[in-house]
Amino acid sequence: VKLYPEGDASARFSLRGAGVLYFYCNCHGLMKAPDFRTATRRTSPQKIHLREPDEGDREQVMAYREEFLAINSRMDGTSALDKYADFDAWLAQLRKLKDPATTPAGLVPATEYLALDEHEHLVGMTNLRHRLNDYLLTYGGHIGYSVRPSERKNGYATQMLRLTLEKAKERGIEKVRICCDHYNVASAKTIRANGGVLEDEQFDSSDGTLTQRYWIQNK
């Protein structure tokens, strides 16, 4: 469990219960971290826009990463941000992934985007793969995305997917494969809201999950 120490604490620990609550203890007493499940929900989502990350996004991106680690949540569509404690190394990897000449073996060229609200606050990330390999055709798709835990249920996922589809169209991708786990009802709803048509479900023996595979006509 991710800890958030403050000051020169003599003792630190965390508790996780049904409420997904995280605590730390320091010399000033017991403190309670935010419960992302009860974050303020907006009656209507702010408009968002996409842009590629740059050096000025260090603080926001790393804070985004910490939110996911704190609740042990998957960071889909982040180009493996969970594996990068070093922002500069992550940014360098994005540049390699975008250029077909430097894309690592076994991967496909892809572009990473930040989803930012009207105040330039980072609410999500989305990743557009420029083409499919066999694995992506079956389990991953052209697009992966995630919404910041504290910004969930604000309607951002539907906007993010729509905007990423526009980026795909700019690249000439007229038929977009997109996948989600069978149990992820919210993600399936987002895909259908953007024109997704379910083709079938595939069992992924590598992790024991059932994957729904959709196509979106993107002409």
Write out the residue ranges for each language-model feature:
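Beta-strand-rich interaction surfaces with strong enrichment in secreted/lumenal proteins
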Residues: V1-L3, E201-Q202
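Short, compact, well-ordered microdomains
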Residues: K2-R37, M125, T138-G140, S146, ...
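GNAT-family acyltransferases
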Residues: R41-H142, K167, D207-K219
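Conserved acetyl-CoA-binding loop-helix of GNAT-fold acetyltransferases
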Residues: G144-V147, K153-E166, E170, K189-A193
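Conserved GNAT acetyl-CoA-binding A-motif
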Residues: A168-C179
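Conserved beta-strand-loop-alpha-helix junction that forms the acyl-donor binding cleft
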Residues: I178-A188
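Conserved catalytic-core motifs of GNAT/GCN5-like acyltransferases
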Residues: C179-C180, G195-R213
